[in-house]
């Protein structure tokens, strides 16, 4: 917190409002491609996003049928980390799986 003195009630209200702001949230998305196996997508969803097998299957089918699927909603740092983890794992396994994030 800053060392400056609060001179009015308005200053206190502004500082309190700033302290209570919710962090920005981001959807993490998986994108369909013609090469990544469905089994690999399910494994990524279970291992990286901590989805149940049923949830992972549902998201994987959305990716397959609609071209995109939502893995979850996270703060910016968590979303960035999960995107990087997906890309690293996909590259290590030789898949071109794309993962992205968008602000909610």
From Swiss-Prot:
Pfam families the UniProt entry points to: ClpS
Query: One biological-process term from Gene Ontology?
Result: protein catabolic process
Q: Which Gene3D superfamilies match?
A: 3.30.1390.10
Q: Which parts of the chain span the membrane according to its record?
A: none
Concerning its family, UniProt says: Belongs to the ClpS family.
- Cited PANTHER family: ATP-DEPENDENT CLP PROTEASE ADAPTER PROTEIN CLPS, ATP-DEPENDENT CLP PROTEASE ADAPTER PROTEIN CLPS1, CHLOROPLASTIC
Record's function text: Involved in the modulation of the specificity of the ClpAP-mediated ATP-dependent protein degradation.
Assembly and partners are described as: Binds to the N-terminal domain of the chaperone ClpA.
- The name on file for this protein is ATP-dependent Clp protease adapter protein ClpS
Q: Which organism is it from?
A: Oleidesulfovibrio alaskensis (strain ATCC BAA-1058 / DSM 17464 / G20) (Desulfovibrio alaskensis)
């Amino acid at each position: 917190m800053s060392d400056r003195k609060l001179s009015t009630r308005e200053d206190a209200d502004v500082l309190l409002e700033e302290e209570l702001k919710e962090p920005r949230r981001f959807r993490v998305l998986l994108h369909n491609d013609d090469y990544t196996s469905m089994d690999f997508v399910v494994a990524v969803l279970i291992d990286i996003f901590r989805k149940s097998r049923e949830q992972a299957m549902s998201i994987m089918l959305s990716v397959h049928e609609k071209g995109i699927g939502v893995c979850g909603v996270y703060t910016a740092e968590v979303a960035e980390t999960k995107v990087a983890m997906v890309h690293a794992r996909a590259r290590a396994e030789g898949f071109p799986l794309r993962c992205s994030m968008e602000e909610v």
